[in-house]
Design a protein with these regions (language model features):
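Residue-level detector of short, conserved catalytic/binding motifs and their immediate flanks
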Residues: 13-15, 72, 98, 109, ...
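A short, charged, amphipathic alpha-helix used as a generic interaction element across diverse proteins
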Residues: 52-55
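Short linear proline/tyrosine/threonine-rich motifs used for host-factor recruitment
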Residues: 27-29
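Active-site-adjacent substructure of cysteine-protease-like catalytic cores
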Residues: 78-109
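ATP-grasp fold ATP-binding core
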Residues: 16-19, 100-102
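DNA replication initiation modules
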Residues: 7-9, 18-22, 32-46, 65-82, ...
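Short, conserved interaction/coordination micro-motifs, predominantly
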Residues: 1-11
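Short Gly/Ser/Thr- and Asp/Glu-enriched loop/turn motifs at secondary-structure junctions
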Residues: 12, 67-69, 102-108
Length: 198
């Protein structure tokens, strides 16, 4: 499977393995370093090049990369049914127009792109919006582990998504806005995105 992985991803230097483990009663993917311990997302020394991780592939359930620096990733969970993408997933794939692959579960997708000079406002936008099953990782000083399968949809390369990412964030990742206005000592007025309430 991984021999079909894009060369530009193979040239990336921050790979790790991952294994399924049960934590708090839930099955989760745990990143693993070739140094025989769990990979720490904040320590890029725990990651390695593609050829090295492939040399250890027998230890793991799969491989992944650290999203750090100018790398970006969009995860959409549970968006494939009967081999078709959901409307939201189709929209995002079309707009972002970058490398896209099917996740290990076979029911989700991941898009990999790059951003330059992008500021991810975590106070304004979710990183993980469970309402849509959507996660966005970009402009991170510390790594965020994501799985890589090589099971690509189409033949797109990893492209710069700096200009299109804000549109995705505005539509799907905005946190609720609630501004409290202090009008006097007796009454507080609340202004929300839907109107003014007393």
């Amino acid at each position: 499977m991984y021999e079909k992985l894009l060369q530009e991803l193979k040239d990336y230097t921050y790979f790790c393995g991952w294994k399924y483990e049960t934590r708090n009663g839930s099955r989760t993917k745990v990143p693993k370093s070739v140094k025989d311990h769990n990979a720490d997302n904040s320590n890029l020394d725990d990651f390695c090049g593609f050829s090295e991780i492939i040399g250890h592939i027998g230890k793991y359930d799969g491989i992944g990369i650290a999203i750090t620096g100018d790398m970006a990733a969009i995860d959409i969970d549970h968006c494939i049914e009967d081999g078709k993408l959901s409307d939201m997933a189709e929209e995002i794939v079309s707009k972002v127009n970058t490398y896209t692959e099917i996740s290990p579960s076979g029911t989700g997708i991941r898009l990999i792109g790059k951003t330059h000079g992008f500021n991810y406002d975590k106070e304004k936008y979710y990183i993980n919006n469970r309402k849509y099953g959507l996660e966005v990782y970009a402009a991170r000083d510390k790594g965020q582990f994501v799985t890589i399968t090589g099971n690509a949809i189409g033949d797109k390369h990893v492209r710069d998504i700096t200009d299109v990412l804000p549109e995705i964030l505005e539509k799907y990742m905005c946190r609720p806005v609630l501004v409290k206005l202090f009008c006097n000592t007796l009454f507080d007025k609340y202004l929300t995105v839907t109107g003014l309430h007393r």
